[in-house]
């Protein structure tokens, strides 16, 4: 079984703004609040951080300041996803030296490509980037589902380390777990499905609600791991 990058609750950070600009002081306070409450990792400029509405310069600033504030205490994961393959590659090249442990890559949105197109998209990213890749499946937002057979084809490249799964179709999640066969770490991508996915073998959650309830989400995961949930 693959060694997880983190175990427990990670927070997909919001991006604090004031007067139309990134509020760096508020971001630093948010990071410190998260760490004081036991989160296991942070995601900077994932989709919760609204990167599609930020400039590249703003995204780089947010990621850099997050890494700086964390100062090595937990892994930081940067969001590089886009609906353009080359844009993802360019984003990773821009962010790769900022100190992140991995990149989170959401499936392309709006384009509604085929599974073959999805495979080609992710394999191009795998070939032309350096940071380890966490796949992000969120069909309610993107209309695309990474199917089990596509996972089977992607995994042998060795570039993919985890799947953030935000599908409510638990039967399909079970099929994906069979396809993964311990070669990727599974994380819940839906707060309300954290407990069911932990019971199915997930190693934690990449959470939105932990922006305001970090201690509670960290405690939920730890209680499950300790057999107290």
Residue ranges and their predicted role:
Residues 127-128, 139-229:
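Catalytic alpha/beta core domains of metabolic enzymes, predominantly
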Residues 2-11, 15-145:
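Active-site beta->alpha loop and helix N-cap motifs at the rims of alpha/beta catalytic domains
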């Amino acid at each position: 079984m693959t060694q997880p990058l983190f175990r427990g609750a990670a927070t997909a950070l919001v991006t604090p703004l004031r007067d139309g600009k990134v509020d760096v002081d508020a971001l630093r306070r948010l990071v410190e609040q998260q760490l004081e409450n036991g989160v296991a990792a942070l995601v900077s400029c994932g989709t919760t951080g609204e990167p599609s509405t930020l400039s590249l310069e703003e995204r780089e600033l947010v990621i850099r300041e997050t890494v700086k504030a964390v100062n090595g205490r937990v892994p930081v994961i940067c969001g590089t996803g886009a609906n353009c393959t080359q844009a993802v590659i360019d984003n990773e090249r821009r962010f790769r030296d900022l100190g992140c442990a991995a990149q989170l890559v959401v499936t392309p949105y709006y384009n509604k490509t085929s599974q073959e197109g999805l495979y080609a998209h992710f394999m191009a990213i795998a070939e032309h980037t350096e940071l380890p890749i966490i796949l992000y499946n969120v069909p309610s937002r993107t209309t695309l589902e990474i199917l089990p057979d596509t996972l089977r084809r992607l995994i042998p490249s060795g570039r993919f380390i985890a799947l953030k799964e935000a599908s409510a179709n638990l039967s399909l999640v079970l099929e994906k777990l069979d396809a993964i066969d311990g070669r990727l770490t599974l994380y819940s991508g839906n707060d309300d499905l954290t407990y069911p996915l932990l019971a199915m073998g997930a190693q934690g959650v990449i959470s939105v609600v932990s922006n305001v309830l970090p201690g509670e989400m960290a405690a939920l995961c730890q209680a499950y791991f300790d057999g107290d949930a």
